[in-house]
Amino acid sequence: MIETLHLARRGERRRESSYNRSGANRDRVVVPPGEAHAVPVLRGPGIIRHIWLTVLPETPTCYRDMRLVIRFDEAETPQVDVPLADFFLFGHGLLVDVNALPIQVSLQHQDAPPHRGSMNCTFPMPFSRSAEVLLANGSGRPH
């Protein structure tokens, strides 16, 4: 992919973000207990090329409580349904630095709150008609 980065590609690029539409600097989504946050449905054909997120957990169990759910092309069963910890390669809910292609996790060390980091995934995830992405909270507290 990097060897063709300089070449023009056909297609439309889109991005979805949690930015605060009011203009305030509170660009985040809080997912209530037992609920899910849905990214607007992507219509295709297309490819999800990058997922980036960070979580402000009160406890380290947040990464086991929160599930990433992805369904392609209106499938009955999601193709991805996994705790964030497993998807981003830190087992037992222990947040650690990960530097592996295509997963990267960077902890915020120093004065940052504990259990906090930035998570990136660059798995290319193609779809023909649609892609639905949810972040589901299976805990008893908001995340």
PLM regions: where:
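Beta-strand-centric surfaces of beta-sandwich/beta-rich domains
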Residues: 1-143
